[in-house]
A protein has these predicted regions:
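Glycine- and acidic-residue-biased ligand/ion/polar-headgroup-sensing regions
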Residues: 16-28
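Histidine- and aromatic-rich ligand-binding microenvironments
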Residues: 4-5, 23, 60
Length: 79
């Protein structure tokens, strides 16, 4: 699944364990619930969520983002 994340908009990914988040264009800021460190992905970079936390994504500025499940569970996306 791929989508555009406009500057300043956010998306909540619920229970994101095993999800690969790839920034295809622009820059994406990621913050995981109760995780001390945030991450910033530039175009071409990706990260795999290693815990069952909720993750918030934000475009800095606009970004193109791809989500790929590494486990067999449905993705639940909330704007």
């Amino acid at each position: 699944m791929s989508f555009r994340l406009a500057r300043g908009s956010t998306m909540l990914l619920r229970r994101a364990a095993g999800l690969r988040i790839e920034c295809q264009a622009g820059t994406v800021w990621l913050s995981a619930y109760r995780h001390p460190d945030d991450s910033v992905l530039q175009a071409g970079e990706s990260i795999i969520v290693d815990s069952d936390r909720d993750v918030v994504l934000s475009g800095l500025p606009d970004a193109q983002v791809a989500l790929m499940s590494q486990v067999s569970q449905p993705l639940e996306l909330l704007p």
